[in-house]
Design a protein with these regions (language model features):
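Short coil turns that delineate tetratricopeptide repeat
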Residues: 31-32, 66, 99-100, 133-136, ...
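Residue-level recognition of tetratricopeptide repeat
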Residues: 1, 5-8, 43, 77, ...
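Canonical positions in the second alpha-helix
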Residues: 25-26, 60-61, 94-95, 127-131, ...
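Start-of-helix register in tetratricopeptide repeats
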Residues: 1, 34-36, 70, 103-104, ...
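Structural motif corresponding to the intra-repeat A-B loop/turn of tetratricopeptide repeats
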Residues: 6, 10-13, 48, 82, ...
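TPR-repeat structural position
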Residues: 9, 13-16, 51, 85, ...
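Canonical tetratricopeptide repeat
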Residues: 39-40, 74, 107-108, 141-144, ...
Length: 363
């Protein structure tokens, strides 16, 4: 499991192969009732974005040991990414019934975050922080609390949470990302860029590379932006050549900075195995950028159907409504996006404000 987490957080696919080799050896030595290895295989499949396989392995692990909370956690993750939100909630409840530890409470927090209940999500994440027994659990909780504060428009609280986490884990990429987003929201764009650069040096993950590239672009540093985008393309090639489905950030990158037509194809491939709200948003944006805004609207609606508070998704739907001539609906989404403006990176914030000015929306 440690190798899986290391691969997921460092973007090193070679570690997945090492983890799989160890897990399959365990299964060969104990082919039946090996809930630990089956849970590991489920986590490995989820890390590779093979969510149907993750669900199957998690169900095997639960059959082997119905009292394995970690198996219910991976099952919840798989159901979430497959778009089976009620099934995910039931799995999270079972996980918490068995062991209400940091991991269980963090998943419960995410259930409420997806539903737009950020206050309840923050409350549960604080309980997760209190229950944390490892530095990685504490770092994860602080990063999530920072993100929830941004979604609520409180950039200073977001910065405080990120900095608390970084005092214990100064090289944690998720915390560096969280601080960068908070700094950007507070207008400290150069400091934000430095944090994103540090984060990508540690873990060149797609969402970090995209944030760094778009921040360089917002600052007019086109050469540096292109360097980040080139690395993002290379990372996506590594993922897909290893059999993984396209990442949502790679789809959004392609839609905005590459070929929208290719972005549509990537999103369609991702949706075949992952009907998650973030994939619907990426597909909607790719369709819109490819000139297919009428088709895009249904997917933008699906992305926001749970009530998730996400400034970027609201901006995307606002742009789609505007393209379709429905400025009243665009105005409503822009108000949601600009009300959560701290959650937008500098490039997206500027784009949302520009759209607002074009249609006369007051934030």
């Amino acid at each position: 499991m440690a190798r899986i987490e290391q691969a997921r957080t460092t973007a090193d696919p070679a570690l997945y192969a090492a983890a799989e080799k160890a897990l399959r050896r365990s299964l060969s030595l104990q082919p039946g009732g090996n809930s630990g290895a089956e849970t590991g295989m489920a986590a490995l499949a989820a890390a590779r974005h093979e969510f149907t396989a993750a669900r199957t392995w998690a169900e095997k692990a639960i059959t082997s040991d119905p009292y394995n909370p970690a198996a219910y956690g991976v099952l919840a993750d798989a159901h979430t990414q497959l778009g089976h939100y009620r099934d995910a909630e039931r799995a999270v409840q079972k996980m918490n019934d068995l062991r209400p530890d940091a991991a269980s409470l963090a998943r419960a927090s995410y259930v409420f975050e997806l539903r737009g209940s950020t206050g309840r999500a923050a409350e549960l994440m604080r309980r997760s922080l209190t229950a944390a027994t490892t530095d990685s659990e504490r770092a994860f909780a602080h990063a999530c609390l920072s993100g929830l504060a941004l979604e609520d428009g409180d950039a200073r609280q977001a910065l405080s949470e990120a900095e608390q986490g970084l005092r214990k884990a100064p090289a944690d990429p998720a915390l560096l990302d969280a601080r960068a987003r908070a700094l950007a929201a507070l207008g400290q764009t150069k400091q934000a860029r430095a944090d994103w650069q540090h984060a990508t040096d540690i873990a060149p993950l797609p969402h970090l590379l995209l944030a760094l590239g778009e921040t360089h672009q917002a600052l007019g540093h086109d050469e540096q932006a292109e360097a980040s985008y080139t690395l993002l393309r290379a990372q996506d090639t590594l993922r897909t050549s290893a059999g993984g489905s396209p990442d949502t950030d790679a789809i959004l990158f392609e839609a905005d900075h590459g070929s929208p037509v290719r972005a549509v194809a990537m999103a369609e491939q991702a949706l075949r195995t992952r009907s998650f709200v973030a994939v619907h948003d990426a597909y909607a944006w790719a369709l819109h950028r490819a000139g297919r805004s009428e088709e895009a609207l249904a997917h933008a609606d699906q992305a926001l159907a749970l009530g998730t508070r996400n400034a970027l998704w609201h901006y995307h739907r606002a742009a789609i409504h505007h393209a379709l001539g429905n400025d009243q609906a665009a105005t409503a989404d822009l108000r949601s996006a600009l009300g959560q403006a701290p959650a937008l990176n500098p490039l997206h914030a500027a784009q949302a404000r520009a759209l607002s000015q074009r249609i006369g929306t007051q934030p």
